[in-house]
């Protein structure tokens, strides 16, 4: 996740927080770890496992003119919790991140080979 976020930040302007959705967001432990790994606040929403259906319904509402603009949707979905990064966890996650990126680089050809096996 951190590598992906850092790559995105090089290409486009991003926000200063992440909204964590899906079934994994039901776990406060997972949300807290994500905040520590990314070192930015992580928001969760009520019933995060249903965001796909909620998003589809809101897109339909915009299409039908019940909601004026897609930009207005953000105000309708408010976070129910915000997980702040633990500064004390930063050193261990930074160390592990460096190790992960080195392991990936050293094994990139092997990963490619494994992905070609059917």
Name each region found by the language model:
Residues 1-118:
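Glycine/Thr-rich phosphate-binding loops that ligate phosphate moieties of nucleotide
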């Amino acid at each position: 996740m951190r590598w992906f976020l850092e790559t995105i930040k090089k290409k486009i302007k991003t926000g200063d927080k992440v909204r964590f959705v899906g079934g994994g967001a039901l776990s406060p432990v997972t949300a807290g770890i994500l905040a520590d790994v990314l070192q930015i606040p992580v928001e969760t929403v009520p019933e995060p496992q249903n965001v796909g259906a909620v998003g589809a319904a809101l897109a339909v509402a915009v299409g039908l003119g019940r909601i004026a603009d897609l930009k207005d949707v953000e105000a309708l979905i408010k976070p129910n919790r915000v997980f702040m990064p633990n500064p004390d966890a930063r050193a261990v996650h930074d160390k592990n991140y460096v190790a992960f990126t080195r392991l990936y680089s050293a094994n990139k050809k092997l990963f490619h080979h494994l992905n070609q096996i059917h």
